[in-house]
Amino acid sequence: MSAIAPITGTIRKRILADITIGFAIGGAMASYWWWGFHKNIINKREAYYAKLAEQKAAEN
């Protein structure tokens, strides 16, 4: 018997944990960017162009 435990499955478990945590954090950050930042910018742009089209229609 050796005094040190074998490291056979530890690396595999650690790699799977790192990949899972990475995807979870990446998904959370991507969701925050999409719903918290990107959608607000797009809504402002769409409102601007709708207002511009309304003004153009009022001129004609």
UniProtKB/Swiss-Prot annotation:
Q: What is its biological role?
A: Component of the cytochrome c oxidase, the last enzyme in the mitochondrial electron transport chain which drives oxidative phosphorylation. The respiratory chain contains 3 multisubunit complexes succinate dehydrogenase (complex II, CII), ubiquinol-cytochrome c oxidoreductase (cytochrome b-c1 complex, complex III, CIII) and cytochrome c oxidase (complex IV, CIV), that cooperate to transfer electrons derived from NADH and succinate to molecular oxygen, creating an electrochemical gradient over the inner membrane that drives transmembrane transport and the ATP synthase.
Q: Where in the cell is it found?
A: Mitochondrion inner membrane
Residues cleaved off as propeptide: 58-60
GO cellular component, as recorded? mitochondrial inner membrane
Please name the PANTHER family in this protein's record: CYTOCHROME C OXIDASE SUBUNIT 6C (PTHR28264:SF1), CYTOCHROME C OXIDASE SUBUNIT 7A (PTHR28264)
Q: Which GO terms describe its molecular function?
A: cytochrome-c oxidase activity
- The record lists the membrane-crossing segments as 16-38
Tell me if Mitochondrion is a UniProt keyword of this record. Answer: yes
* InterPro entries in the cross-refs: Cyt_c_oxidase_su7a_fun (IPR014368)
Keywords of this protein's UniProt record, alphabetized? Membrane, Mitochondrion, Mitochondrion inner membrane, Oxidoreductase, Transmembrane, Transmembrane helix
Homology family: Belongs to the fungal cytochrome c oxidase subunit 7a family.
Look up the record and name the pathway of this protein.
Energy metabolism; oxidative phosphorylation
Summarize subunit and interaction data from the UniProt record for this chain.
Answer: Component of the cytochrome c oxidase (complex IV, CIV), a multisubunit enzyme composed of a catalytic core of 3 subunits and several supernumerary subunits. The complex exists as a monomer or a dimer and forms supercomplexes (SCs) in the inner mitochondrial membrane with ubiquinol-cytochrome c oxidoreductase (cytochrome b-c1 complex, complex III, CIII).
Q: Which residues lie on this side of the membrane: Mitochondrial intermembrane?
A: 39-57
| Mitochondrial matrix topological intervals | 1-15
Q: How does this protein lie in the membrane?
A: Single-pass membrane protein
Q: What is its main location?
A: mitochondrion
Native organism: Kluyveromyces lactis (strain ATCC 8585 / CBS 2359 / DSM 70799 / NBRC 1267 / NRRL Y-1140 / WM37)
Q: What is this protein called?
A: Cytochrome c oxidase subunit 9, mitochondrial
What Gene Ontology biological process does one annotation of this record name?
Answer: mitochondrial electron transport, cytochrome c to oxygen
